[in-house]
């Protein structure tokens, strides 16, 4: 049977493929080009390294020029002061329970500084507290066994002595803390974490700070607060001013972590100048006293009962300086307790409690005359008292 070709041409071919989309082909081409460029960019350093020569070009050193004036001053200060600072290591003698042998156990490290040509070294009391022996290392590497001359736990100051026969290190120059200003530059040299002769810088952040004493002892007053980095091992080292003079002994930090947090404290040099000569001379610090007895708890009760301020004198020692000046203590009569003299201030500085009174007296020396503002039975007067040696 013949095929009608015209009839077949009237219907489309169901298997005919659609014509390619030129837009899709163009997009695929662009995508491939972008991917190739990205790969080339990624491996470009490797390609450059492969084809470039293996020899590295030498770099020229850029001239630095002169150091800044403050840099020169800091460098000069450290170079002059370094030899006056020492590294202290302590050890404790321990007896073995079974063998009864005695051996030395390392205890801690700290810093100190040369006080005079006689070989006296000043440091913190807590650096050598509980130690059986101490070794002092000089900046030139020499080591010496140190002997304890004296200590004042109330001021956290101790004096050691070493026997340097030749090439004695220079004593650190001494300044004053009476005219310090907040904002002054300060420099701390010490051995933080055993890193010997480390220099840190900062400023005086505040003055006349107080810290509680060890084991409930009297507070340490008139401390210098600084933001110079002070860490464990800096204790006992010098705090210097921009002239390289001693203005304090680095003694404590305030830090939750135990490391420097920008709040450090130093015992002022004026306190050091008052305490150290006594330690060298007598081995202990003798506090100046009035010759009276006071008690903080009883004083607070009396102040609450009378609604007053100051420090009540509980008892006057017969023959004491206070007795000669006419001060009187509390009397117990059949009618009750009769308050005696109440000290309002010392040399014009208020004494709000017993601790403040003792701090005011501690600023002076035995033999100094202080002016007390006292009140008894509602009448005020001023009394001059020559300070005597305390107990």
Language-model segments: which ranges?
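A structural signal for beta-strand boundary/capping segments at domain termini and interdomain linkers
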Residues: 143, 380-382
């Amino acid at each position: 049977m013949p095929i009608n070709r015209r009839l077949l041409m009237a219907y489309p071919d169901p298997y005919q493929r659609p014509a390619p989309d030129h837009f899709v082909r163009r997009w695929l081409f662009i995508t491939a080009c972008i991917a190739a460029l990205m790969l080339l960019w990624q491996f470009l350093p490797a390609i450059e390294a492969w084809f470039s020569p293996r020899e590295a070009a030498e770099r020229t050193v850029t001239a630095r020029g002169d150091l800044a004036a403050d840099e020169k001053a800091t460098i000069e200060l450290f170079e002059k002061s370094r030899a006056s600072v020492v590294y202290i290591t302590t050890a404790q003698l321990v007896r073995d329970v079974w063998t009864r042998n005695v051996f030395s156990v390392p205890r801690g490290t700290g810093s100190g500084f040369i006080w005079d040509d006689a070989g006296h070294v000043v440091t913190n009391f807590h650096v050598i507290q509980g130690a059986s022996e101490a070794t002092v290392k000089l900046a030139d590497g020499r080591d010496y066994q140190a002997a304890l001359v004296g200590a004042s736990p109330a001021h956290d100051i101790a004096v050691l002595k070493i026997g340097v026969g030749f090439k004695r290190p220079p004593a650190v120059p001494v300044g004053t803390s009476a005219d310090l200003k907040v904002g002054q530059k300060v420099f701390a040299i010490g051995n933080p974490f055993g890193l010997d002769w480390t220099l840190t810088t900062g400023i005086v952040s505040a003055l006349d700070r107080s810290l509680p004493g060890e084991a409930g002892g009297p507070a340490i007053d008139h401390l210098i607060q600084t933001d110079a980095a002070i860490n464990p091992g800096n204790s006992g080292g010098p705090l210097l001013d921009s002239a390289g003079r001693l203005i304090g002994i680095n003694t404590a930090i305030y830090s939750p972590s135990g490391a420097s947090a920008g709040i450090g404290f130093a015992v002022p040099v004026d306190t050091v100048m008052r305490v150290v000569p006594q330690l060298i001379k007598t081995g202990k610090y003798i506090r100046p006293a009035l010759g009276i007895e006071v008690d903080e708890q009883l004083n607070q009760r009396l102040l609450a009962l009378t609604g007053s301020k100051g420090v009540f004198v509980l008892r006057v020692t017969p023959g004491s300086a206070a007795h000669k000046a006419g001060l009187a203590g509390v009397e117990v009569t059949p009618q009750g307790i009769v308050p005696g003299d109440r000290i309002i201030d010392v040399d014009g500085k208020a004494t709000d409690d017993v601790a403040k009174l003792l701090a005011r007296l501690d600023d002076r020396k035995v033999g100094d005359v202080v002016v007390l503002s006292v009140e008894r039975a509602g009448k005020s007067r001023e009394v001059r008292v020559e300070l005597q040696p305390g107990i």
